[in-house]
């Protein structure tokens, strides 16, 4: 296990890892994939990995793509392939922003029916 700086991206379909992280982990590609990013299209390598979130939640056998995200100081970009496995929430109670994620999904969160 290697600690990694990650970004949760609801606009990303899939999860990506930096070229550097793929090398550090000595990953062997399982294939190639054509992808479309905000900066254009590319053919990238695919890998199978286990991702540990918050040192406790393990997401096994995730197909990830290598990416230039290392240029942004990131090791992992977590996309909707992982986010859609569970419940994802952001709150800003008392001026403090908090993020929460759990797998499996347990219920719909809908604040419109909550009395103020």
Identify what each model region corresponds to.
Residues 1-116:
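Pepsin/retropepsin-fold aspartyl endopeptidases
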């Amino acid at each position: 296990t290697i600690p990694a700086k990650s970004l949760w991206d609801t606009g990303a379909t899939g999860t990506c890892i930096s070229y550097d992280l793929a090398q550090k982990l000595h990953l062997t590609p399982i294939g190639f994939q054509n992808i479309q990013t905000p900066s254009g299209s590319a053919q990238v390598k695919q890998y199978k990995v286990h991702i540990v979130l918050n040192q406790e939640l393990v997401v096994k056998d995730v197909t990830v793509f290598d990416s230039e995200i290392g240029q942004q100081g990131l090791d992992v970009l977590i996309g909707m392939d992982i986010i859609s496995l569970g419940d994802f929430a952001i709150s800003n109670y008392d001026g403090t922003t908090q993020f929460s994620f759990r797998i499996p999904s347990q219920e719909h969160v809908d604040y419109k029916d909550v009395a103020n």
